[in-house]
Swiss-Prot record:
Transmembrane segments: none
Originating species: Oryza sativa subsp. japonica
Bias (Basic and acidic residues) ranges: 376-385, 393-406
GO cellular component terms, A-Z: cytosol
Family (UniProt): Belongs to the IGBP1/TAP42 family.
Gene3D superfamilies: TAP42-like family (1.25.40.540)
GO biological process, one term: regulation of dephosphorylation
Name listed for the protein in its UniProt record: PP2A regulatory subunit TAP46
Length: 418
């Protein structure tokens, strides 16, 4: 609790540094409903991530004032149940929940006190709801049972919580649609005819619907509070573990890492300086140079040449302008690659491939022209003409034979009486 008070004092001191603190002091005389309306509006803005740190701190201050006023007025007691709480006071049960959510969003260098303060507010909200019998029996049984923290148990709790959260959201949506339908019907009735004495009962349902809406909102807030409390506990455990490790050997470990990196950098620069005067590479023969030689006749396509496609280099190596002299630099350059697929060949390689294809087509075309002009091709055309003449002579001979031998001429010898 001492850390919670320290966080509260720090946030109050930071709030006084802003010009809006004077306006907040002027709002100190506002009644509880007005303060709650302002604070809930800021909470809704913070939930939609449309509120800066100044607005978050202002909302925390307003919610803290609401919490103090609720405590002074004694609106809730541990001896009461939810049926004993009036409908107008149900919404003030959400003050510690809103305060826990808003406190968790406060940006601070040391986050552990913020997490503890947020957890305290959420636990206060859960304890008040438990005293008023607002928590479901299933949730109470899960929290009371000391089961091992396994993945199956956590999954079962999350599934049950999600179902209750979905039911609360559905209930709120139904109440909203019901109110909208009643508003439209009353508006239409007022335009058509005045409301009679028997129709005034329609207004009496507003109080019951408002109570149902606030109870559903509290049920939804409870589901979110349990999930947020689990998340804050895990975050606090992680931060405490990191802080403990840093306090134990964090400085020594960081110093060793820096010394090792410094030694490697110095050794790399020393080797590069010694290697520079003697290891200047010759200008490589690129694919573009080889393609120009092929076009101008100084080289042939079949000549041995390694057409290696070097991919584009992104990242520090390309910015510095140096070559990749070590395996580490090549691996680092491969990290800074674009999101799209790189080409598999260069323009020069594609041009050389097209040149090879064109040469093959030219050779094939020349061969076909040579075959068409060859002697065997011409002889083949003359033999085809002779074949046509032979077919014509054969057809004429067949016609002559049919004239000499009419149909059925030789069958008389086969008859019995012939």
């Amino acid at each position: 609790m001492v850390e919670v008070e320290e966080v509260s004092n720090k946030m109050q001191a930071q709030m006084r540094l802003h010009p809006a603190a004077a306006a907040e002091e002027e709002d100190a005389d506002l009644p509880l409903p007005a303060l709650f309306d302002k604070a809930s509006h800021l909470h809704s803005l913070a939930s939609s991530s449309s509120l800066d740190q100044e607005g978050i701190r202002k909302g925390v201050d307003l919610l803290r004032r609401c919490d103090e006023m609720v405590s002074k007025l004694g609106l809730f007691s541990s001896n009461e149940t939810k049926d004993d709480v009036s409908t107008a006071n149900l919404k003030y049960l959400l003050v510690p929940y809103y305060l826990g959510e808003m406190t968790e969003r406060v940006a601070q260098e040391d986050r552990i006190p913020v997490l503890k303060a947020s957890q305290d507010h959420l636990k206060e909200f859960i304890s008040i709801c438990e005293a008023l019998e607002l928590i479901s029996e299933d949730e109470l049984e899960l929290s009371r049972q000391k089961q091992p923290d396994t993945m199956a148990n956590r999954r079962a709790q999350k599934v049950a919580r999600f179902k209750r959260q979905k039911a609360a959201e559905t209930k709120l949506l139904e109440i909203k649609e019901r109110k909208e339908r009643r508003r439209r019907s009353l508006r239409a009735a007022a335009l058509s005819a005045p409301i009679e004495a028997g129709e005034e009962d329609a207004f009496e349902d507003d109080g019951e619907e408002e109570r149902e809406a606030w109870l559903a909102t509290i049920s939804l807030a409870l589901c979110k509070a349990f999930d947020l409390l689990d998340m804050l506990k895990k975050e606090e455990e992680m931060l405490l573990a990191v802080k403990e490790r840093q306090a134990k050997d964090g400085n020594a470990f960081a110093r060793e890492m820096l010394d090792e990196r410094t030694k490697k950098a110095e050794a790399w620069h020393h080797n590069a300086a010694n290697r520079a005067p003697y290891s200047k590479p010759a200008d490589p023969i690129t694919c573009a140079t080889f393609a120009q030689d092929v076009i101008e006749g100084r080289a042939s396509v079949s000549q041995a040449h390694e057409h290696k496609h070097q991919p584009l280099i992104f990242g520090p190596a390309s910015l510095v302008g140096g070559g990749l002299t070590s395996e580490r630099e090549r691996m680092a350059a491969q990290v800074f690659q674009p999101s799209y697929r790189l080409p598999t060949m260069s323009i020069e390689e594609a041009g050389l491939r097209e040149m090879k294809m064109m040469e093959k087509w030219q050779e094939r075309t020349a061969k076909m022209i040579q075959e068409s002009n060859s002697a065997w091709h011409k002889d083949g055309s003359r033999s085809a003409q002779e074949d046509e003449d032979a077919e014509e002579e054969k057809a004429r001979a067949w016609d002559d034979w049919k004239d000499d031998n009419p149909r059925g001429a030789g069958n008389k010898k086969l008859t019995p009486c012939g």
